[in-house]
């Protein structure tokens, strides 16, 4: 009802606010016997963690995760896994000026209208700080997918503003603060970030996420199609305003003869569908792209209103990302992994004994 959970068998429920005492989540449906330590989760959390480069918010949270339950002697027990991350670097005084003012482009106005009350400190529950717990839960899913099925989920920054980053080298993604796979674009990205910082403005971005070695058969017709659930999960990430599966909106200008993924005895000849046909995984790489809006927390004055409906001009102070798309890469990976793990467990539960003589590649 409250919209704080995702998944049916592998189910993740998060709680906490940006400037609250802590963030937490409960992860249900994790199979028993999976080796799991806090270090397994910390790797991805460190990739998402704020304050790690000059291109992201300078709020410095260690994001040290603690496992509270569901793991005994280094392996999962099959019971609920409780996770918690304490907030340590809140500066709530930065937000006192907006207590009675609605920041344009943020959730302040809609939360106030929906609940009649809001935590104005850092956006409260609407803050992207909440996604730390998604990344922690996603790390569990990523480990299970990799160990049990050889599925690898990876993401990268595909575009910031007018700077397009081609997928040239996966290894480059972890070698720079932008998660950029194209080393030739790093200088342009750096120049863009410096210009935005000087102007006090922000910029949008495109993030791509790819899952390889996904088994064929994942997805439930008709409302729980794999692509529908992926779109739901990825659209739930803060600032995401669009999701594409495979070639996405570019199919508008294509003919059917060029867009269809033809099949030969050697396998599929293309992957315009992004690894999903009829809402069910085809065994090809599952590919999704996300469009993220530029953050509205900027130093450029903007018009808004206060609680009394009076016109106000404001500047959003605090520590903010000039491009939220940079830190969205591990978040997108986590959400794709969560959906894939849930569908793998659902497929195993219903169709685990199904045998098909049709070739698989």
From Swiss-Prot:
Cofactor (UniProt): FMNH2
Pfam families given in the database record: Chorismate_synt
Coiled-coil segments on the chain, per record: none
Residue positions binding FMN: 125-127, 238-239, 278, 293-297, 319
Cofactor binding, per record: Reduced FMN (FMNH(2)).
Annotated binding of NADP(+), by residue: 48, 54
CDD domains: Chorismate_synthase
Disordered: region residues: 37-59
UniProt catalytic activity: 5-O-(1-carboxyvinyl)-3-phosphoshikimate = chorismate + phosphate
Cysteines paired by S-S bonds: none
Any one of the GO BP annotations: amino acid biosynthetic process
Gene3D superfamilies (alphabetical): Chorismate synthase AroC
Name by which UniProt lists this protein: Chorismate synthase
Species for this entry: Serratia proteamaculans (strain 568)
Gene that produces this protein: aroC
């Amino acid at each position: 009802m409250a919209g704080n959970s995702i998944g049916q068998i592998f189910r993740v429920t998060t709680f906490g606010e940006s400037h609250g005492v802590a963030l937490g989540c409960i992860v249900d449906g994790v199979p028993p016997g999976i080796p799991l330590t806090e270090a397994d989760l910390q790797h991805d959390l460190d990739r998402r963690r704020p304050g790690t480069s000059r291109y992201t918010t300078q709020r410095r949270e260690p994001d040290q995760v603690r496992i509270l339950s569901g793991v005994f002697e280094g392996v999962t027990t099959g019971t609920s896994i409780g996770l918690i991350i304490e907030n340590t670097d809140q500066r709530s005084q930065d937000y006192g000026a907006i207590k009675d003012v609605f920041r344009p482009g943020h959730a302040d106005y809609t939360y106030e209208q929906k609940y009649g009350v809001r935590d104005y400190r850092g956006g409260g529950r609407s803050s992207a700080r909440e996604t730390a717990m998604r990344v922690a839960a996603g790390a569990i899913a990523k480990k299970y997918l990799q160990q049990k099925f050889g599925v690898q989920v990876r993401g990268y920054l595909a575009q910031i503003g007018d700077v397009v980053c081609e997928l040239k080298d996966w290894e480059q993604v972890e070698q720079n603060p932008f998660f950029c796979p194209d080393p030739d674009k790093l200088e342009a990205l750096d120049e863009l970030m410096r210009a935005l910082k000087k102007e006090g403005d922000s910029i949008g971005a495109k993030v791509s996420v790819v899952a390889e070695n996904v088994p064929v058969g994942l997805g439930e017709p008709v409302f729980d199609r794999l692509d529908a659930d992926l779109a739901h999960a990825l659209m739930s990430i803060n600032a995401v305003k669009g999701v594409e599966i495979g070639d996405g909106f570019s199919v508008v200008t294509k003919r059917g003869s060029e867009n269809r993924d033809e099949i030969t005895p050697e396998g599929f000849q293309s992957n315009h569908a992004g690894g999903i046909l009829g809402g069910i995984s085809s065994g090809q790489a599952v590919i999704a792209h996300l469009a993220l809006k530029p953050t509205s927390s900027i130093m450029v004055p903007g018009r808004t209103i206060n609680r009394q409906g009076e016109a106000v001009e404001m500047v959003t102070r605090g520590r903010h990302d000039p491009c939220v798309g940079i830190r969205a890469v591990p978040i997108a990976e986590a959400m794709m992994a969560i959906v894939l793990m849930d569908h793998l467990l659902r497929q195993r539960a219903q169709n685990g004994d199904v045998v098909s003589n049709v070739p698989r590649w």
